Curated annotation (Swiss-Prot):
Substrate binds at R13, R14, E15, Y16, K71, Y128, R132, S136, R196, L197, H198. This is Pyridoxine/pyridoxamine 5'-phosphate oxidase. Homodimer. It comes from Yersinia pestis. Pathway: Cofactor metabolism; pyridoxal 5'-phosphate salvage; pyridoxal 5'-phosphate from pyridoxamine 5'-phosphate: step 1/1; Cofactor metabolism; pyridoxal 5'-phosphate salvage; pyridoxal 5'-phosphate from pyridoxine 5'-phosphate: step 1/1. Belongs to the pyridoxamine 5'-phosphate oxidase family.
Length: 217
């Protein structure tokens, strides 16, 4: 793109000096280490520490990625919510395999979950939906996610219309809005290290236990 060498991405580099990750730092259950790192990301005041890159694949094998917010996690899996007509929801209906990446750049860390996504029950979705701010609930009605629109004004007009409609009482749950639980069987932790000698550990589920291996950077 540039011939005068004013900007070359190959020259953008830095050392990773925030410390390493040793086997003695690991927990038996990867979710415990994930929770520790997530809390540290929050304490470090990282912007959107629960933001994760969600990767899905369409029927042609074309991968897609987008940023989504984590809303719950436990031993059963990681939970996020979305419009069920969205591209990611449609792709997960065809192929439930999914990857989640948490990029905590300021801490030189990332965590990758691999697994399968399954739809949440209506009761679970309803409980979360009504915990959201009312304007966010209305916003769920406004957006037919991933559909083509002529202008932003279309969304804003629809929002004002529905805000008036739902001014009194509760906002009902849209039939096209739901959530997914990612049941993971692989978790990789990456910690940046000096001289590009990064630390990587992968947890892989084996029956009722987790097998842990160190990976070359």
């Amino acid at each position: 793109m540039t011939e005068n060498n004013e900007f070359d991405v190959a020259d953008l580099r830095r050392e990773y000096i925030r410390g390493g990750l040793r086997r003695s730092d690991l927990t038996e259950n990867p979710l415990e280490l994930f929770e520790r790192w997530l809390k540290q990301a929050c304490e470090a005041r990282l912007p959107d520490p629960t933001a994760m890159c969600v990767a899905t694949v369409d029927t042609n094998g074309q991968p897609y990625q987008r940023i989504v917010l984590l809303k719950h996690y436990d031993d059963q899996g990681l939970v996020f919510y979305t419009n069920l007509g969205s591209r990611k929801a449609q792709q997960l209906a065809e192929n439930p395999h999914i990857s989640l990446l948490f990029p905590w750049h300021m801490l030189d860390r990332q965590v990758i979950f691999l697994g399968k996504a399954e739809r949440l029950s209506t009761l679970e979705v309803l409980k979360y939906f009504h915990s959201r701010p009312k304007d966010s609930q209305i916003g769920a009605w406004v957006s037919q996610q991933s559909s083509r629109i002529s202008a932003r004004g279309v969304l804003e007009s629809k929002f004002l219309e529905l805000k008036q409609k739902f001014q009194q009482g509760d906002v009902p749950l849209p039939s096209f809005w739901g959530g997914f639980r990612v049941k993971f069987d692989s978790v990789e932790f990456w910690q940046g290290g000096e001289h590009r000698l990064h630390d990587r550990f992968i947890y892989q589920r084996e029956a009722d236990a987790w097998k842990i291996d160190r990976l070359a950077p």
